Amino acid sequence: MSKLLSYTARIILRNSRITVRQLVRGFAGFVSGQRNAPQPAYGRPVPGLLRQKMVSSIGKRSMFIQTQDTPNPDSLKFLPGVEVLGKGNTYDFPSGTAAHCSPLAKLLFRVEGVRAVFFGSDFITISKEESAEWSLIKPEVFAVIMDFFASGLPILHEARPNADTEILDDDDETVMMIKELLDTRIRPTVQEDGGDIVFISYENGVVKLKMQGSCSSCPSSIVTLKNGVQNMLQFYIPEVESVEQVFDDADRMADKEFERFEKNLKQKEPAGAPVGIGGGPN
């Protein structure tokens, strides 16, 4: 398997037309399938690049907001058509208590059913509670985003996005290489899915990372981490032996809530009925 990965990587690297996304997905050994096209506001079918013109009542400014599905059915990308944090920058708000540095995040957490908020370069990812409906959440999120950008208020107060991959004076060569690879090859691909990947630590050959945004509770996050990220890091950095995902209290709480919901679902279903949770964003 390792020989096959090495051969594949060398072939890919010789071809300058191959994108970073294709390179990472090539190491992953799986294809997540074609993404659904961006959805227009309120679900109206519009030909071409689906978009809905939305006019803010503040100022007379107009805004085009698109939504795009992610691999996680409980997370949705909102693309306002303007810069959010700027190229390559992200900021994660796993709970309302973490939103103290962002007026926009505070407003979004006031929308009933919103569980987590994530800011990217030009998008905002909203993660909802399992029982909440996108048909009810989306109109309120659209209104909050439009009104906020029309107000001219800063998105963040005294916060530095992406500080995890900043090169420090005491970083050794291996750590610097890991951070560089995360920023240039891995992070851009993960951000396309409405999430991010954060460097936590490196010690004794083990790289510890944290998934954010739509990737934090996505069922395929472990596969992405092991088959994609780990293989790429090991290929370029022989010192890396394994990659582990780090969970915080918010992640553990979300997992417990999901387990409780799934347990209740199984108890309500008649014997012999297929068990599963279906459906994506409405």
Curated annotation (Swiss-Prot):
| Localization, UniProt | Mitochondrion
Q: What processes does the entry annotate via GO biological process terms?
A: iron-sulfur cluster assembly
Domain of life per record: Eukaryota
The answer to whether keyword Aminoacyl-tRNA synthetase applies is no
Q: Where is this region: Disordered?
A: 263-282
> Which residues does the annotated region (NifU) include?
178-246
Q: What GO molecular-function term can you cite, just one?
A: iron ion binding
Enumerate the residues binding [4Fe-4S] cluster.
C215, C218
Q: Which InterPro entries match?
A: FSCA_dom_sf (IPR034904), Nfu/NifU_N (IPR014824), Nfu/NifU_N_sf (IPR036498), NIF_FeS_clus_asmbl_NifU_C (IPR001075)
> What are its GO cellular component terms?
mitochondrion
For the keyword Transit peptide, the answer is yes
Instruction: Tell me the keywords, alphabetical order.
Output: Iron, Iron-sulfur, Metal-binding, Mitochondrion, Transit peptide
Which portion of the chain is the transit peptide? 1-27
* SUPFAM superfamilies attached to this UniProt entry: Fe-S cluster assembly (FSCA) domain-like (SSF117916), Hypothetical protein SAV1430 (SSF110836)
Similarity remark: Belongs to the NifU family.
* UniProt function note: Molecular scaffold for [Fe-S] cluster assembly of mitochondrial iron-sulfur proteins.
Instruction: Please report the name of this protein according to its UniProt entry.
Output: NFU1 iron-sulfur cluster scaffold homolog, mitochondrial
- What is the scientific name of the source organism? Drosophila persimilis
